[in-house]
């Protein structure tokens, strides 16, 4: 996986990309991440990358030339040709399906927006605009870190466990089932007996039921689009009746 990030603040990425899973993925050559300072592609000696908006208004707008020159540089370096993404509040909401699509692309270019945004002509040159939520942050750097982390987890070999990514929340459209570890008894709260039984079939059934229940209670909006297995719809109906009887829905 080749990921190129165009940013005004490359130093922000040192911590997140130099530790944990992403660090190991880079060291093993599974993910190639390179940062490019947009100021290096400014057409003037002052390294200017922004200007006042035509028509007036507050704030500054990122100029199109430095970003275009940076994209051309990526093509010359063999890092172009992939999916070009602009991180901005107006983009499509990022989710697990988005992460899967970007991971499948093989090459990814992330443009971190800043100030009041980018010149509209930059938007015309990208393949996709992504937002990480209905809120505004200072720039696209932190959203880019989030996108890279979610995408890298889906690259084959990055996670230690072969099925690790498949068990995560949202992987099948559902929230993940509850997880437990030692001690068996903690402040009077015991680990469910089924998890100690050694009966893998019963454990899988319990986990599926808990994933359905947790999604139904916490994120019912996910249910319709989730990938359902045999018997899931009937189980959901039973769970919904139980919750209604308990006055929880």
UniProtKB/Swiss-Prot annotation:
It is an enzyme of class 2 (transferase). GO terms for molecular function: tRNA (guanine(37)-N1)-methyltransferase activity. One of its GO terms (cellular component) is cytosol. It catalyses: guanosine(37) in tRNA + S-adenosyl-L-methionine = N(1)-methylguanosine(37) in tRNA + S-adenosyl-L-homocysteine + H(+). Signal peptide: none annotated. It holds the Pfam family tRNA_m1G_MT. CDD domains: TrmD-like (cd18080). S-adenosyl-L-methionine binds at residues 113, 132-137. GO terms for biological process: tRNA N1-guanine methylation. It is found in: Cytoplasm. It comes from the Bacteria. Belongs to the RNA methyltransferase TrmD family. Specifically methylates guanosine-37 in various tRNAs. Homodimer. This is tRNA (guanine-N(1)-)-methyltransferase. It comes from Desulforudis audaxviator (strain MP104C).
């Amino acid at each position: 996986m080749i990921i190129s990030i165009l940013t005004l603040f490359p130093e922000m990425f040192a911590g997140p990309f130099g530790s944990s899973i992403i660090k190991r993925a880079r060291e093993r050559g599974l993910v190639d991440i390179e940062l490019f300072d947009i100021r290096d592609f400014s057409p003037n000696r002052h390294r200017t990358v922004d200007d006042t908006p035509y028509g007036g208004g507050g704030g500054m707008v990122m100029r199109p030339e430095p970003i275009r020159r940076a994209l051309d540089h990526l093509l010359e370096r063999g890092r172009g040709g992939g999916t070009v993404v602009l991180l901005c509040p107006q983009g499509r909401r990022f989710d697990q399906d988005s992460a899967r699509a970007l991971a499948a692309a093989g090459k990814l270019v992330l443009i971190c927006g800043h100030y009041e945004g980018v010149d509209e002509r930059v938007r015309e040159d990208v393949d996709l605009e992504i937002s990480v939520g209905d809120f505004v942050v200072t720039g696209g750097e932190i959203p880019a870190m989030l996108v890279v982390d979610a995408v890298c987890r889906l690259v084959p070999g990055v996670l230690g466990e072969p099925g690790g990514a498949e068990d995560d929340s949202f992987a099948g459209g559902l929230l993940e089932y509850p997880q437990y570890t030692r001690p068996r008894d903690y402040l009077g709260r015991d680990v469910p007996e089924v998890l100690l039984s050694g009966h893998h079939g019963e454990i899988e059934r319990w986990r599926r039921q808990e994933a359905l229940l947790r999604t139904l209670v916490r994120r019912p909006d996910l249910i319709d689009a989730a990938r359902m297995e045999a018997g899931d719809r009937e189980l959901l109906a039973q769970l919904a009746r139980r919750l209604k009887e308990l006055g929880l829905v």
